[in-house]
């Protein structure tokens, strides 16, 4: 609905949410790896809708509507399917209009209702590489948990022995795949 009427740049994101067959870059995602895309996983496991995660304020919707009419929004390029994709936004940017902190996008009373300390305790069995312990400072949920592309274990940037959950990517692989997909899509246009 949203993509059909107004948000043409949402096609790539909707496809990753609805079927999980491709990520926002238009790259095929094997069935066994689809659960690593949190939008798809939440839709399949909990029936979460787009608006279940993206909770816009009225002022945000008006601003987006005006930007859409004026064509004043930033497109990063086209994906491999020729669909426009937007510049990546952080969780802090996605929650700014609500006056919420970035991790509140995920950790709130409607979704993952727990504190940072409770999350760290729940994953304590991961040992010294517990990604929720923030041994190196605070890391936003979205730095690892990706909604419309395969999730990435950020710890792997420095720790080569960091465990990769099923379907997840090491940071280097994720960066290379995204860059390769964008380059291929944009060279196809030329």
What is each model feature region?
Residues 1-190:
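Short sequence/structural segments immediately N-terminal
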